[in-house]
């Protein structure tokens, strides 16, 4: 989000927007619960949610177009790195990326590919257009250095589900999870400490 604009997604396809002065409700055209939303600028953003829904706006949320995700499983998070590139993640090892504005979503190469990766993913954060992290069940931590096309697994030392991840800069980041779990890195995810 941006200094003067905030978007929030919720139940039954609801999105609300704050323009710096007031809140307004936006019509998305979907009735599915939305779980995450991310805008790269004041115009371009994606929202994701239950039943594999991905929707995109290029006009600040005034109108939304549904994208083909290739799944009916829940998509938990989205991170938009440019007006044409984004990464989504969800249940059953689901990570896809687009470099064409959402017209095509490509399956990411995950550790052990082509063997199905069975972690559920809950959160994504990027520190640049190419470097990003995904967290999930069983202490799963993945990192990409090519914008989401391929991912490598990093040991976290925890088995708790990691619900969220956030980086303050290229090197320093935190992940939080069940049972009060909090881990941090100061070396771009190479090592994680409690």
Regions found by a protein language model. Give the residues of each.
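Residue-level hotspots at or immediately adjacent to binding/recognition sites across diverse folds
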Residues: 1-194
């Amino acid at each position: 989000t941006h200094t003067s604009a905030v978007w929030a997604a919720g139940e039954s396809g609801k999105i609300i927007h704050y323009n710096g002065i007031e809140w307004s409700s936006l019509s998305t055209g979907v009735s599915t619960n939305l779980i995450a939303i991310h805008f790269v600028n004041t115009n371009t953003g994606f929202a994701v949610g239950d039943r594999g829904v991905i929707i995109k706006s290029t006009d600040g949320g005034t109108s939304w177009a549904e994208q083909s995700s290739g799944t009916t499983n829940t998509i938990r998070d989205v991170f938009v790195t440019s007006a044409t590139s984004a990464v989504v993640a969800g249940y059953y090892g689901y990570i896809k990326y687009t470099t064409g504005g959402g017209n095509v979503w490509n399956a990411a190469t995950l550790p052990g590919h082509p063997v199905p990766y069975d972690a559920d993913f809950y959160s994504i954060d990027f520190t640049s257009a190419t470097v990003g992290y995904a967290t999930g069940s069983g202490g799963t931590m993945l990192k990409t250095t090519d914008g989401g096309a391929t991912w490598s697994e990093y040991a976290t030392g925890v088995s708790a589900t990691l619900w969220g991840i956030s980086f303050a800069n290229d090197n320093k980041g935190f992940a939080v999870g069940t049972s009060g779990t909090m881990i941090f890195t100061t070396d771009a995810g190479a090592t994680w400490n409690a």
